[in-house]
């Protein structure tokens, strides 16, 4: 048994990990403030945590990891902080381009990319295209960039309405399955587990459609300090729950 599998065993897991885990990467700013550092240092530390957790998820058999990198509301932050976040994303993508194909990691973006700087938008599109041909069985990381759950649903509704107006669809054709194909997450299963570090206990406009039956796990650990052991705890907590999807326990 590999070292990774030994870790899983000692974590007390009852079964395989969730197929899809989503994380609200929260607490970067507070982590930096506690250490007397600029908020940008917290985002840099948080980016390294993402790398580590993504690799760990891939190694333990998680198929999809979706992370909240930048919300539609984050534009309200200072120009310095927004620029630092975008620079980190650019740095990560430039480095990832050279390794994703080799490591069989697919990268996909959720969100409205229109307001994103052209250079970063083109880079995101390039990385998406580079990994598009990889097997559907390979690990996939979804990065939510300029993303908001309400905005995602609204964009999908507008697309459906436009097709109805053009006579391509009829309103009565629409059901949950069809509507989901208009979302950023089209073709991707809903997350079984949503994790939020930092002690906050709210969704913050994250995956509002997809979270209908997700389990939620909250921890006071700030995102830069979130490690493999913390993820093990979250998965163990998830596996201890009775998921009934609106039914009753048998």
Task: Locate predicted features.
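Flexible, compositionally biased loop and terminal segments
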Residues: 1-250
């Amino acid at each position: 048994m590999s070292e990774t599998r030994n870790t899983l065993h000692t974590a007390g897991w009852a079964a395989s990990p969730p197929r899809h885990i989503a994380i609200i990467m929260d607490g970067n700013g507070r982590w930096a403030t506690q250490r007397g550092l600029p908020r940008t240092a917290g985002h840099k530390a948080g980016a390294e945590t993402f790398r580590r957790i993504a690799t760990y998820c891939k190694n333990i058999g998680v198929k999809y990891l979706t992370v909240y990198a930048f919300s539609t509301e984050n534009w309200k932050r200072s120009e310095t902080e927004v620029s630092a976040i975008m620079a980190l994303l650019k740095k990560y993508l430039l480095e990832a381009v050279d390794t994703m194909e080799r490591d069989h990691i697919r990268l996909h973006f959720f969100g409205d990319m229109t307001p994103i700087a052209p250079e970063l938008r083109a880079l995101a599109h390039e990385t998406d295209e580079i990994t598009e041909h990889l097997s559907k069985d390979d690990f996939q990381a979804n990065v939510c960039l300029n993303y908001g759950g309400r905005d995602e649903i609204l964009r999908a509704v507008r697309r459906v309405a436009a097709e109805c107006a053009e006579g391509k669809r009829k309103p009565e054709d629409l059901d949950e399955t069809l509507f989901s194909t208009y979302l950023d997450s089209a073709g991707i299963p809903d997350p079984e587990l949503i994790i939020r570090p930092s002690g906050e206990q709210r969704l913050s406009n994250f995956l509002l459609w997809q979270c209908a039956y997700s389990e939620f796990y909250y921890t006071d650990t700030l995102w830069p300090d979130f490690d493999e052991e913390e993820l093990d705890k979250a998965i163990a907590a998830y596996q201890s729950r009775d998921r009934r999807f609106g039914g009753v326990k048998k």
